[in-house]
Each structure stands twice: as C-alpha cells, then as structure tokens.
Amino acid sequence: MGIRTYRPYTPGTRQASVSDFADITKPKPEKSLTTYKHNKKGRNNRGVITSRHRGGGHKRLYRIVDFKRDKYGVPAKVAAIEYDPNRNARIALLFYQDGEKRYILAPAGITVGTEVISGEDSPFEVGNALPLYKIPLGTEVHNIELVAGKGGQMVRAAGAAAQVVAKEGDYVTLRLPSKEVRMVRKECYATIGRVGNTEARNIKLGKAGRTRHLGRRPHVRGSVMNPVDHPHGGGEGRAPVGRSGPMTPWGKPALGAKTRNKKKASSRLIVRRRR
C-alpha cells in the first residue's frame, strides 16, 4: 500500500493524503458476508448521548469478519484482498476447501493465492492461527483471544502487532502495541504476523469534510462553553480553568487521571502497565 498526496489546489488538498488502494483486488464485497449496520449516532437504547461527537457519515455495510478462526484443519486460499469501511485494516476473503467463504483481517504481506489454515498443528506461517503455546518466542502476532474460543479481541488495528516474550505454566506473556506487558492463557488463539495496511496511521484527512464523512462531529472545547455546560466554561474572554486541574464535562479529573478499576480481576495478569 502507498500514500497519494495532492498539489495544493485548495486549502483542503494542501494537507490531504489518501491511500492508493493498490492492494485492493476486489471492488465489491461478498454479498453473503455482509449485513446492515444501524448508525446509532452515539446514542443508547433510550436515545441519550453516551458517546459525544458521533453522527452522520456515509452509510456502511458491515462485513462479517471471522475473529474466532475456529475452522480447524481445513485449508483455505486467499481469493481477494478487500476494503472494509468499518476499520483501517484490509480484509482477506478466504475460500475454504469445503466450499465455505469467510473474511479475516488481512496480515501484512499476504497476497491472493496464499494458503492459510488454523489449528494446533498448523505450519508456522503468516496468516495461520495457532494456540499461543505453539508459537515461538519473539514472534509477532495479532487478533489475540483473551478468553479461549471467544474470538480475537486484542491487536486488530491496521499495522498492529504484539510480541510473544515468555511462556510459563498456563500463561503466555505478550508485549502489546501500547508497551503493556500482560499474560494470556496459553490455549488462546492468535494469528501469526502483523495486521496489514501499516501506512494507515500516516494518512492526513486534510479537511473537516473527510472527518464528517467518517461519522465524527465537531469536538467543542469546554473553555468556550457556558458554565452550565462545562466546568471550564464562563469567564470574561479567555479564562483559566479555575480548578485544581482540567475536568471532564461531568466534573471528574481529566488528562492523566487513572480510570482503571483497581479491583478488576484481570489486573493480576498485567505485568507492566501501558506507558
């Protein structure tokens, strides 16, 4: 994948860059693997905003991606690399030998015609899914399960990879992209390699319109609001916060305050917190 930049014809194109989509081999999705996804616009079941600054954007079909990789021992060939509007990573369309079709996250370096397989005795190759205890130390992995059989929950973003750093007893220790070091049960599955589309982080949207196209609405600063709307609001002109530190719109400490519950059971599995 490459990145295309534009000449400064307009203020929007001056800073903008886009993917060249050279890695895409199939323009339309597999119809049987798509479903309609309702745009909730950041609202819950009562219509109350629970996630601010969301709404609008282009309509999308959801691609049903196989995060479980539970078709053990059945080889599959990569039939196409496709665009997915719901994530930065590309997805790979697999044709299994028994006729089934599935999508997976496309690892970096995978191409049309590559054969992949999942299972305990799978060969050690990019795109294959194995239990963590079968994966050698130092290997880059992605789409990692936290609970065996539940499907991959960690390390799924474009360009992301975790590293296997230790094995001891029933647990395998991983270094995550955030530099957090944590233990995961050894029977949990992970996929060999790094998630593809590694250049996604370098793309610049360039203008507000492209951000709106993604379904993100303007993020208004609290300091320009009224006191009734935000703890930072009010005052004459540009006023300081007027509190011991910056606050969220609901009056809780922001910017640096730790939010993780200390009583969380999984805290004992975290060897080193993220930086």
Curated annotation (Swiss-Prot):
Family matches, as InterPro entries: NA-bd_OB-fold (IPR012340), Rib_uL2_dom2 (IPR014722), Ribosomal_uL2 (IPR002171), Ribosomal_uL2_bac/org-type (IPR005880), Ribosomal_uL2_C (IPR022669), Ribosomal_uL2_CS (IPR022671), Ribosomal_uL2_dom3 (IPR014726), Ribosomal_uL2_RNA-bd_dom (IPR022666)
GO molecular function: rRNA binding; structural constituent of ribosome; transferase activity
One GO CC annotation: large ribosomal subunit
Chain intervals with Basic residues compositional bias: 259-275
Record carries keyword Ribonucleoprotein: yes
Alphabetized Gene3D superfamilies for the sequence: 2.30.30.30, Nucleic acid-binding proteins, Ribosomal protein L2, domain 3
SMART domains xref list: Ribosomal_L2 (SM01383), Ribosomal_L2_C (SM01382)
Described purpose of this protein according to its UniProt entry: One of the primary rRNA binding proteins. Required for association of the 30S and 50S subunits to form the 70S ribosome, for tRNA binding and peptide bond formation. It has been suggested to have peptidyltransferase activity; this is somewhat controversial. Makes several contacts with the 16S rRNA in the 70S ribosome.
Family membership noted in the UniProt record: Belongs to the universal ribosomal protein uL2 family.
Protein's recorded name: Large ribosomal subunit protein uL2
Source organism per UniProt: Crocosphaera subtropica (strain ATCC 51142 / BH68)
